[in-house]
């Protein structure tokens, strides 16, 4: 966990104008995805001395990646001069498609592993993400999208 703490610390605090981690394109979403998958999947598995399941960690990483893109689309105006995100490089429409394709990949991954409950959840997630291009309400982002992350573990097995 210490390397991830260091990564987040150095991302947030710039010690030099020339070398700022946050200026590396797409790094924000990777940090968020890595930290969530590490904290929610890898650490509990390591602490419990169970057999490490890379599939759950991989699924969580991709899922958090896909769910984070709508937040980046919403924050495009705020991040414009500070942080380089996928929507700034590709535009909101292409970023949205990347998010949808990520969820679709997880759907097929779950289907391949006969996890029908996760398939159902990926379909529900895609449907919930559709309004993210138009809705800018804090309620939608705070309760609906973040709520998906809260109930996500129920469907991953």
Question: Which residue stretches match the model-derived regions?
Answer:
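Small-residue-rich segments of transmembrane alpha-helices in multi-pass membrane proteins
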Residues: 25-43, 88-96, 143-157
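Solvent-exposed interhelical
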Residues: 64-102
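Generic secondary-structure boundary signal with a strong preference for alpha-helix termini
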Residues: 40, 45-47, 84-87, 103
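Functional transmembrane core segments of multi-pass inner-membrane proteins
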Residues: 25, 29-70, 76
């Amino acid at each position: 966990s210490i390397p991830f703490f260091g990564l987040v610390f150095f991302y947030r605090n710039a010690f030099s104008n020339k070398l700022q981690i946050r200026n590396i394109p797409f790094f924000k979403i990777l940090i968020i995805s890595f930290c969530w998958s590490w904290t929610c999947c890898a650490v509990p598995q390591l602490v419990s001395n169970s057999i490490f399941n890379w599939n759950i960690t991989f699924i969580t990483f991709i899922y958090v990646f896909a769910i984070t893109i709508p937040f980046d689309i919403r924050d495009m105006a705020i991040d414009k001069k500070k942080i380089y995100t996928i929507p700034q490089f590709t535009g909101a429409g292409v970023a949205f498609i990347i998010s949808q394709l990520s969820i679709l990949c997880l759907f097929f991954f779950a289907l391949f592993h006969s996890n029908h409950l996760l398939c159902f959840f990926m379909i529900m997630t895609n449907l919930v993400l559709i309004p993210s291009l138009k809705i800018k309400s804090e309620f939608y982002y705070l309760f609906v999208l973040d709520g998906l992350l809260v109930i996500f573990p129920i469907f991953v097995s």
